[in-house]
Amino acid sequence: MKINGKEIPYEKEVTLDILMEKQGFDIKKIAVMKNGEIVPKAEFGSTMIGTEDSLEVVSFVGGG
């Protein structure tokens, strides 16, 4: 699978929320596209990510 263009070695399917946490992302502060489609945050726990999927992750940072 790829995350932000970088190949990530993973041998099995995993839910999006678990994958993001294992990769160090704060799931409360990110938006994710899976294969070009936005994944609603409410579906992170039920969205399966396979070895051929490509993810784009955007982190939100507060500021002022």
Where are each of the predicted segments found?
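Compact, glycine-rich, soluble single-domain proteins
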Residues: 2, 7-35, 39-44, 58-60
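A short glycine-centered flexible hinge/capping loop motif at secondary-structure junctions
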Residues: 63-64
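Loop/turn positions that initiate beta-strands
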Residues: 52-55
